Amino acid sequence: SIADILDDLDKEIMCRSIILYSEGKNFCAGADFSKSNFINGQNIYENLYKQALRIFKSSKPIIAIIQGAAIGGGLGLALSADFRITCKEARFSANFGKLGFHQGFGISVTLPRIIGNQQAKLLLLTSRRINGEEAYKIGLADIITDNNLLMEKAEELANEINTSGPLGIKAIRNTLNDGLVEEISNAVVKEANEQNRLRNTKDFKEGINASIKRREAKFIGK
């Protein structure tokens, strides 16, 4: 898993920063809601977020390359990085409301921390999808470039970080992130509880069916 790899890299003295990226057209398009075990599984969210929490405990600066979609939990993964490099074709969305659901992966903490509470509310309550240019404008992405230059720009940033003293970088990052892991740890418990509650509602089932069939959901508030 990603968390296992990050744990291993934390032990590597020669590793001073990490580039997080995916192969293919998307960074991470979120959960596959067509899988029945997602809906019926017990404690699936608690187990998932325990693993996610490990990512936030990494001691090395993480640079995420966001191409294509970063949707739902995929957005949460992108937000776990220290920096995000993207292109105009990328798509970002906290689409939980459109599913009759609740955000997870610590997004309750990371999204407002990065773009501010009002912008976070706007994205979460509307479930709107924004492109890379819009993400850059609101601070969701730190660098925007052409799709074919994403890795080059990520390596440039990593090399810039790597020229600084590793002990100093670790100390600076620890101070800036002071209390973040604890805050996210508390948030994911609340997120998981809300997700477990909402997954048994008619609205959630309607939201999933509408998403799969690519139609507008008809929510009834039950």
Language model features with spans:
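Anionic, Ser/Thr-rich low-complexity intrinsically disordered regions
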Residues: 206-211, 219
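CoA-thioester-processing core
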Residues: 51, 55-57, 65, 71-125, ...
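A general structural signal for well-ordered alpha-helical segments in protein cores
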Residues: 48, 108, 117-120, 158, ...
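C-terminal long alpha-helix characteristic of the crotonase
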Residues: 3, 85-90, 132, 141-189, ...
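Glycine- (often His-adjacent) and acidic-residue-rich active-site loop
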Residues: 3, 7-14, 21-57, 70, ...
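Acidic, divalent-metal-coordinating active-site segment for phosphoryl/phosphodiester hydrolysis
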Residues: 128-134
